[in-house]
Amino acid sequence: STIRRVAVNYPELDGMYDNLTIRCQTLEEILADKLISFSATDTHIRHRDLWDIPWIVRAQEIDFSAVAALVAAKHADYRCPASLASMIAVGMQRAHVCYADGSFTGQMQRFLSPAVLDRTHDFDNHCDALNAIVERCYGRVAASLGISDQVEHARRRLATEISSGLISATGMPKRNLVLS
């Protein structure tokens, strides 16, 4: 965590909070949490993380060795059942599918105003760019941890499981619904 001054975003509050500081997470820790939560949750997809991850990376210079160390520590702390390499592979695959199948766009329409969506004239290309950023984030974490080969192996195994129908394209376990 870090201590930061409160940002004054409204002119009418100018001068009221100039000396106020708060303890908050660093952007590296927030990014690590989002990378873990997006790839490790298998009950629902956190589309908002796909918006936040590129925003965090573009907001300022990120120390990816710190992000990687935090991802590894959080993976252990949260007792994630999948290996770290498999979790990263699932995150990459899931991001690709969510950006490509329109589910990300559909979810973002709930959060973004029509004006913001209209400013992004070619949203498909925008999604491709966002996907590249997210994939690069996972890749940099894997490289920092020295597990890039393991992630690539996990990605190939994941592709095989998807093509054989064992899991969905988003890396989610297929669930059998019991109707009564």
Residue map of PLM features:
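Structured mid-to-C-terminal alpha-helical surface segments
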Residues: S1-L179
